[in-house]
Amino acid sequence: MQKGIMVSSDNLFKDYNNLENIDFVFVRAGYTDFNKSKTKKLDTKFYENYNLALDKKLNVGVYYESCATNLKEAEDEINYLLDIIKDKKINYPVIIQIEDDHNTIIYHPNSQKNTNKDHLLEIVLYQIKKLNEYGYNPVIKTYETWYKNIFKGKITNIKFFLDNNIEYFDDIY
């Protein structure tokens, strides 16, 4: 069984010299901010984390934190992600994180939590299709309840990574 980590500017892995039990790393490429303008942002540590993982000869995947609530936003996010990862050595899956459950006055009034289940399914199917078209192996990271209530049985050709907030996660293959 393989063991891996997820790293980002929010969740730095401090010691890349102590990775004897780590086989792969997922580096956050970027995210859509859940502010009112839903700004797409590059993770400020993407290139550093990506290069450190390559230097340590780890298998590398990436992830993007989606806030898409319609197909136009999903298209914009996927194009943004594809632009970030083009020409990168990605030999592990590309994870789309579907966990936007923010909905307050401060944040954008539309969140994935409040999106119609059929529309959210359509968004995820679009994201999977686009990643497949570009030769990537997509994985969807989401809450267990969202998986059971929205995706289970409706998307069968990919893996899901169910968020249980642990530091390390075991092989997703």
Predicted segments with their positions:
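Boundary/entry segment of secreted carbohydrate-active catalytic domains
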Residues: 1-32
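Solvent-exposed loop/turn segments at secondary-structure junctions
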Residues: 9-13, 30-34, 66-71, 100-104, ...
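Acidic (Asp/Glu)-rich catalytic clusters
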Residues: 12-21, 43-58, 81-90
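Surface-exposed substrate-engagement region within the catalytic domains
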Residues: 19-22, 79-173
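Conserved beta-strand segments of the P-loop GTPase G domain that flank and frequently precede/overlap
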Residues: 25-28, 63-66, 97-98, 141
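Acidic/histidine-rich, surface-exposed loop or edge segments in extracytoplasmic proteins
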Residues: 31, 59, 108-110
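Second-shell loop/turn segments in exported
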Residues: 35-40, 64-71, 108-118
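Glycine-rich anion/phosphate-binding loops
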Residues: 44-45, 68-82
